[in-house]
């Protein structure tokens, strides 16, 4: 991915850190290296314990999973922060990833059903592969499905945990939270699938769900969510219904079931 002495080739280093993130010690930069664009992700050591723990967990996940020969992991590099000349005052590690596009960024109006099917199928295949390796992603959202060189990749593994030992603390984005998480249940394969269902529903319907508070999100997910799709993509309703069941026992139990549903009902 990068030359060994890449640090001396960094150009146009630009901070894209949100103020709220900076307050918690999290920093993001974009840069160019040999005419290719990259993201640099960094956590200030000892600034905020939870953020640091999550970041270190993500670094370890990258180190561990690279030996599994998966096709949904971006090429990456982890380096000491002080090897980057512009960041020599920083301690700790930096995660470097290539710049990517949003996998679900395209308007469905410009795509035929076969293109939409392939987009959804690729995302479900990646989720299936992650789960089959024994992991829950734990932070499924639209921006964590990326396109690089026309292929799908997953990113942001800070909340990724082994299925056998999920987090006891539910730390999730309310927009994507399965109903059971609002009641204190641990994350699971099925909460990943519910979150993916929300990603898919917003993309297929071309609208964003709206809520003003954590309580409002809880009411929406636990009581009020009603799937309404344009006629042009009604073929995907059975898939969404299985992903977005409010009762966990009625939801798909794994991503393989979702793929089977997609195949059966798409007629493509």
Protein language model features and the residues they cover:
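ATP-binding glycine-rich loop module of kinase domains
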Residues: 24-60
């Amino acid at each position: 991915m990068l030359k060994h002495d890449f640090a001396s080739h960094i150009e146009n280093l630009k901070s894209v850190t949100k103020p709220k993130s900076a307050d918690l010690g999290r920093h993001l930069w974009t840069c160019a290296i040999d005419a290719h664009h990259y993201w640099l992700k960094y956590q200030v050591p000892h600034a905020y314990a939870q953020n640091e723990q999550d970041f270190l967990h993500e670094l370890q996940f990258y180190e561990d999973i690279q030996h599994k020969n998966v096709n949904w992991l971006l090429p990456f590099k982890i380096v000491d922060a002080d090897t980057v000349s512009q960041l020599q005052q920083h301690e700790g590690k930096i995660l470097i990833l290539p710049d990517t596009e949003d996998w679900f960024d395209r308007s469905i109006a410009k795509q035929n059903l076969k293109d939409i099917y392939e987009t959804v199928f690729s995302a479900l295949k990646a989720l299936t592969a992650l789960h089959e390796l024994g992991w829950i992603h734990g932070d499924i959202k639209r921006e964590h499905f990326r396109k690089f060189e026309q292929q799908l990749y997953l990113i942001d593994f800070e909340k990724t945990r082994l299925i056998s030992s999920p987090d006891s603390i539910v730390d999730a984005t309310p927009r994507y939270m399965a109903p059971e998480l609002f009641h204190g249940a641990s994350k699971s394969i099925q909460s990943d699938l519910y979150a993916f269902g929300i990603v898919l529903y917003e993309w297929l319907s071309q609208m964003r769900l709206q809520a003003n508070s954590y309580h409002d999100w809880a009411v929406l997910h636990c009581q009020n969510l009603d799937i309404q799709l344009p006629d042009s993509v009604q073929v995907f309703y059975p898939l969404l219904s299985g992903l977005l069941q409010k009762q966990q026992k009625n939801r798909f139990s794994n991503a393989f079931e979702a793929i089977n549903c997609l195949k059966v009902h798409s007629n493509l």
